[in-house]
Amino acid sequence: MSETLHLSAETRDRAGKGASRALRREGRTPAVIYGGNEEPVAIHLEEKALVKALGTGHFFNSVVELTVGGQTVRTLPKDVAFHPVTDRPEHADFLRVSKDSVVHVNVPVIFANEEKSPGLKKGGVLNIVRHELELVCAPDAIPDDIVIDVAGYEVGDSIHISAVKLPAGVKSAITDRDFTIATIVAPSSLKSEEGDTTKTDAEG
């Protein structure tokens, strides 16, 4: 599970593009806290602190505790808008969450034991169909990643979501089909040889 991140913020008295530009000139990033059956709260936070949090690599899969006016608000980052040229964060959205909340998150997939896959040892290629899985879980149960063991897989095999053991309390958001995450495909050289053999047989 990703560590909880902590950021300090202040409420915004004024909204609008002009006020937002003024905040950015001061090194602050405009943001909003919404959800949880409460009114949205316009805030701003230090740009450097936000950039540092983004640099952790698990920002969007972490609970972020925002300290605003002496109160701590548990949130999940939902979106960050970046400047198209400078790549500076221009705005951030935070969703209020509680321990009873259920959230949708995209979690990266990591493939393990590739050296134990007969198909890969023969020169097969791991064709990754999904680099992330859309999961449903409580905010405090968001995994850092999902590890998929490819030991034993042969060329032509497919890895479906049904073969993946998810952590306790974590479910796939897609439930209407047993979707493919990756396949072990034959190397192009092998395909070429098979094609040549077929062509020769046809000519003969």
Swiss-Prot record:
One of its GO terms (biological process) is translation. Coiled coil: none annotated. Residues 1-23 are annotated as: Disordered. It comes from the Bacteria. Keywords: Ribonucleoprotein, Ribosomal protein, RNA-binding, rRNA-binding. CDD domains: Ribosomal_L25_TL5_CTC. The keyword Protease does not apply. InterPro entries: Rbsml_bL25/Gln-tRNA_synth_N, Ribosomal_bL25/Gln-tRNA_synth, Ribosomal_bL25_b-dom, Ribosomal_bL25_C, Ribosomal_bL25_long, Ribosomal_L25_dom, Ribosomal_uL5_bac-type. GO terms for cellular component: cytosolic large ribosomal subunit. The keyword Ribosomal protein applies. One of its GO terms (molecular function) is 5S rRNA binding. Belongs to the bacterial ribosomal protein bL25 family. CTC subfamily. Part of the 50S ribosomal subunit; part of the 5S rRNA/L5/L18/L25 subcomplex. Contacts the 5S rRNA. Binds to the 5S rRNA independently of L5 and L18. This is one of the proteins that binds to the 5S RNA in the ribosome where it forms part of the central protuberance. HAMAP family: Ribosomal_bL25_CTC (MF_01334). NCBIfam families: bL25_bact_ctc, PRK05618.1-2, PRK05943.1. This is Large ribosomal subunit protein bL25.
